[in-house]
Amino acid sequence: MIDPTETYMNTLVPMVVEQTSRGERAYDIFSRLLKERIIFLNGPVHDGMSSLIVAQLLHLEAENPSKEISMYINSPGGVVTSGLSIYDTMQYIKPKVSTLVIGQAASMGSLLLTAGEAGMRFSLPNSRVMVHQPSGGYQGQATDIMIHAEETLKLKRRLNEIYVKHTGQDYDTIEKALERDNFMSPEQAKEFGLIDEIVENRSKADDAES
């Protein structure tokens, strides 16, 4: 069976060639955009992806701790602990992190979207956002299953608290909203507090940030 994450990672990446004083230099497109402090969070969230995103965030902080970072998100979600490592790093570093959903920000993707700097969380007009509670499956001894179930409930409460912090909604509202898969249009996501603005072009995004 083909691993969909391997298929995604093996997608052909365009190269960009630049003229420098030492001649031509080639970058893959993502490395070139990283020079502009742009990070792409595309595809399922897992340990491999989170380590790359965290490394990029820390690199950009070391390069310039006062200049903002832009994170473009198109993700169906994924492993909660992997996503939380990205979330914690976003809150830990000094630069402000602007987030923009392109396509979709679902599950853990929606949490990372709303974790951007207040006033700097954006959506393109045809994107969608989906929030829900964490899920998991376990097998083994009954006691171990009970332990894992209790841990999942603790994780659910912690995720709810993070949404409360960044959306301004009360805990009961968040818990109700995340009870099932809850798809939102950009307008609904803005009203709920997951994003700050819906942007159609770059000039509007720049105006919103200023």
UniProtKB/Swiss-Prot annotation:
CC per GO annotation: cytoplasm; endopeptidase Clp complex
EC code(s) of this entry: 3.4.21.92
GO molecular function: ATP-dependent peptidase activity; ATPase binding; serine-type endopeptidase activity
Superkingdom of source: Bacteria
Keyword Cytoplasm: yes
Primary site of residence: cytoplasm
Reactions catalysed, as given in the entry: Hydrolysis of proteins to small peptides in the presence of ATP and magnesium. alpha-casein is the usual test substrate. In the absence of ATP, only oligopeptides shorter than five residues are hydrolyzed (such as succinyl-Leu-Tyr-|-NHMec, and Leu-Tyr-Leu-|-Tyr-Trp, in which cleavage of the -Tyr-|-Leu- and -Tyr-|-Trp bonds also occurs)
Gene3D superfamilies, per the entry: 2-enoyl-CoA Hydratase, Chain A, domain 1
Secretion signal span: none
GO biological process, one term: protein quality control for misfolded or incompletely synthesized proteins
Active site: S107 (nucleophile), H132
Compartments, as annotated in UniProt: Cytoplasm
Annotated Pfam families: CLP_protease
Family, per entry: Belongs to the peptidase S14 family.
The protein's role, per its UniProt record: Cleaves peptides in various proteins in a process that requires ATP hydrolysis. Has a chymotrypsin-like activity. Plays a major role in the degradation of misfolded proteins.
Cross-referenced NCBIfam families: PRK00277.1, PRK12553.1
PANTHER family per the UniProt record, alphabetical: ATP-DEPENDENT CLP PROTEASE PROTEOLYTIC SUBUNIT
Subunit structure: Fourteen ClpP subunits assemble into 2 heptameric rings which stack back to back to give a disk-like structure with a central cavity, resembling the structure of eukaryotic proteasomes.
Name of the protein described by the UniProt record: ATP-dependent Clp protease proteolytic subunit
Lineage start: Bacteria, Pseudomonadati, Pseudomonadota, Alphaproteobacteria, Rhodobacterales
